[in-house]
Amino acid sequence: MELSAAAERRESVTPVLQIRDLSVARSGEVVIQEINLDVRKGEFVGLVGPNGSGKTTLLLTILGLLEPIPNTGGEVRLFGNDGFSKSDHGRIGWVPQAGSKIPNHIRITVREIVRLGTLNSRSLSVFGGSSINLRAERALEMVGLVDKADSEISRLSGGELQRTIIARALASEADFLLLDEPLVGVDLPSRNSLLKLLDDLCHQENMTILMVSHDLTAISQAAHRIIYLEGGVRFDGPSEDLPDLSSLAGLRGITHVHDDHGHGH
């Protein structure tokens, strides 16, 4: 859905994501406490922290699947609006962790998975089914999977499966991607290829990305900005300004792999 010129100007200055004094509890335990942060259009933000620090909890709260603590838990604003609304469905692409290899009895193809993403498209009600194939093919092209489009997902590598999930999100015409550990279960070449893809989406498509990763080296190479989360925000800035990269990497649940084949800014 096209935005008016006035709406585009307003969105250019309004952060895609605004979080104010956010606190979230799970099973009666406070996991996130008084977080404040903004994410602006076209930013690639990496979210790191030890296991149990609230990274996935934060993503689920942004998606509206978890609620702030009642009365005192702060707020989440998306595209200048209060909370996750129905109109946001097509604008936010959720990329969960791909997990283990798909069983052989699952016979769905890459193209069929990606076409599912078009069901959330903002323009579906305007253009109808005639644009479904075009959007799916465009998404496959963006992630480099055109030649795998008719392959069954059980035959994909970890990196190819993760690209398929990203393509499904892109097919919805999302302009804000939330990714939860997309590098898990992929080999080094696939990891670097995925990071290059995300970097290209930011620079060429002006995509906004918030990505959770336990791989501090990889996310530092790719992201414009790093947020280190442990209960609250302990660091928020460029990766080169991290106060002590080696000590952060030594915390539980974070890996720091030296690699000269990554890319960065």
Regions found by a protein language model. Give the residues of each.
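H-loop/switch region of ABC-family ATPase nucleotide-binding domains
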Residues: S213-H214
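Conserved ABC transporter NBD signature motif
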Residues: N71-D88
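Conserved catalytic motifs of ABC-family nucleotide-binding domains
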Residues: E173
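Conserved ABC ATPase "signature" region
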Residues: R115, G129-K148
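Conserved ABC ATPase signature
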Residues: E152-L156, E160
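H-loop (His-switch) and adjacent beta-strand-loop-beta switch element
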Residues: I226-P238
